[in-house]
Amino acid sequence: MAAESPQARRDGPAPILFVGGTGRSGTHVVAKLAARNSNYRLVPVECRFHTDVEGFPGLLAGDVSKRAFLKRMQGFWWRGFQTDRLRGLHRFVPRERFDEALAAFDGRFDEDREDACRRLFLDLLWPVTTEGRSGEASGIVEQSCDVVAQAPTLARLFPEARFVHVARDGRDASASRVSQRRWLVYPRTRKQGLEWWERRIRAIDEGSKAIPEGSFLELGLDDFLTRGARKDSIEELASFAGVGAGMRMRHFMRRRMNPGRANRGRWRRGLEPDAQAKVEREYVEVLERLERDGITCAPILRRAFERERAEGSERAVA
């Protein structure tokens, strides 16, 4: 394994690095990038029991009973069908460990709810730091989309955690979401997709206010795909994570993060020029609202928009 560069943060890796976004925004590929070093291990699925409203947030707010939480843990979060495939903790957590962790949680919860939730999370996920052939790691990278939106809960349970928000052009993210749902459930249309995306961005912005200063980073997926900006982005991510941007991270970025693989500009597919212009007008209105309201990722989104517009103008001239 190549040695890490000497540019790592002085305080070193975080025990927990949460990577989130709106959904369809590049969270998974950035989480994989962050874990491409000897200090972190990637939790290979979105676990979601700590971010869904039926999970830790609702449980600790008193809106969800322990019984209902345990039922969902043993059902959907263990082995759930979503978007044409089975997902859930069963993909990497041995059943014996799962059952033991739930039993321990059940016994602790009534005495100290927050401690029980924290320990359940660690009992289930922390063992990935010692599994595999790469030796023991210092921390985990967890990639459930809502980790930043649910930071009021997670930052309280895990004060040692750091949070990354990956922002993507809302036209691409929302088009991907509409396509993923196959127009069967909301959001079904491009307009609904932008509405869905804007609400998610605002929830992330609100949630991020609960994160301690110095423990939150926002990055643009588009910047990882652009020559020049990609070097700055990987250095920023590595520094924030407390590691060096070593050869494994750089190789992964070169191989897996490019405009083609990221489907940059996918929102144009299947739309006639007039329909594309309509989507663009609606998106500009969304961007202007976000900028007016001081949403912190708005400059990242504006930069991606202007870059895509410039590239479109160049294609038209050519």
Predicted regions and their residues:
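P-loop (Walker A) phosphate-binding loop of NTP-binding proteins
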Residues: 21-22
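A conserved segment at the C-terminal end of the G1
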Residues: 28-40
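Proline-centered flexible-loop/turn and helix-kink motifs
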Residues: 38-39, 159, 212, 284
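Catalytic beta-strand/loop signature of glycosyltransferases that borders the donor
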Residues: 43-46, 247-249
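PAPS-dependent sulfation machinery
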Residues: 44-140
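PAPS-dependent sulfotransferase catalytic domain
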Residues: 103-109, 113-117, 122, 126-248, ...
